[in-house]
Amino acid sequence: KNWYIIDGQHRLEAYKIVGVPVRYLIRDDMKIEDIRSLNSVHMKWSLMEYLMSHVKLGTPDYKYIEWFIRHYSIQVKESIAMLQGFHYSTNEQLDTFKNGKFKMTHLEEASKYAERIREIHKYFEYAYSKKFIYAILSVFANKSFKWKHFIDKLSKNSSKMRVQASRVDYIVCIERLYKHAPIIAVG
């Protein structure tokens, strides 16, 4: 029979090297939920690890968020917010996600916004940063925002878009770029 070490692989290797006896427990009934719970005591799981555990379990909506993350190169936390129609992620959303109760409600809108972020990335290398994504999602939600106007301004004035310290600073930077008027030469 094949045996697998679920937790403590590195500890086992270290004990082998120094010749210390190893205590172990053999269980045939371990489930991925048990492993997740076991590991959360020793080391915090990343959102990607939670995602993959739910994908393996076949939890609805998780295979779609996995596709979204891989297709658009957007991090898990930002993808959760986008796919639920938010401009930022909350602890409540993240807990719901970890517990396998994530529901995707805004795939079409999130995909449209992700395509726009991809387009922005051509002109601004930090377009995939968390602060920028949360800022641009807030801007996209503004009814008076015109995408074509913005991308035209960005393509002609990309040097005006710079790394910012916060989401709010990015919103101010985006607004300045959006309202930027070309300098008129007076002769």
Predicted regions and their residues:
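Accessory terminal alpha-helical modules
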Residues: 1-187
